[in-house]
Amino acid sequence: MVDKSGKPRVVYLGAEYCPYCAAERWSMIVALSRFGTFSGLSTVHSSTTDTPSNISTFTFHGSSYTSKYLTFTPVEMETNIPDSSTGGYTTLQTPTKEQQALLTKWDAPPYVASADQAGAIPFIYFGGKYLSIGASYDATILSGLKWDQIASDLNNPDSPVAKAINGTANHITAAICKMTGNQPASACTATVQSLEKSL
């Protein structure tokens, strides 16, 4: 799947309350920043009542992303604010028909383990070539950490936080590099290209 200009598309569907989305967003921001630039990212935390709770993260809602290599379309479907009328969370963004069709087709068995896992988030669609559904690493690694602590830990490659976030970011980068023909070289390094073989 490409956009009108022929650039490959990455589509993300998640929600602000979701702790697994909270964890995945860190890796997505690291990976996507290798190909382009974000603006308007805002801090948010996952639900205080979910497990793990209160994960410090960013929201893609209200942000923009520019890249000459790919198009990134994020959809944050719900906030982290409980909605007593539904027992869920308040609606934030509604997926388009096309985005909902991707979720319905690909976020279901056999791409998830069972029917009760259908619709799992985070859901990341890499241009019709790859899927990432659910958590890529243990979100509890981020439990109790504030944004500045996580950012600081990312500068220490031996920290559990950096290993989890950057390790996942490298796999996301590898998937994107497969779609961009290994461009740019600054992102699609030899290490990343070796990861492409495992996708």
Language model features: what each stretch is:
Residues 9-15:
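Short glycine-rich or small-residue beta-strand-to-loop segments that form or flank ligand, phosphate
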Residues 15-26:
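Conserved redox-active cysteine motifs that mediate thiol-disulfide chemistry
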Residues 1-9, 23, 30-199:
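Non-globular targeting/processing and membrane-anchoring segments
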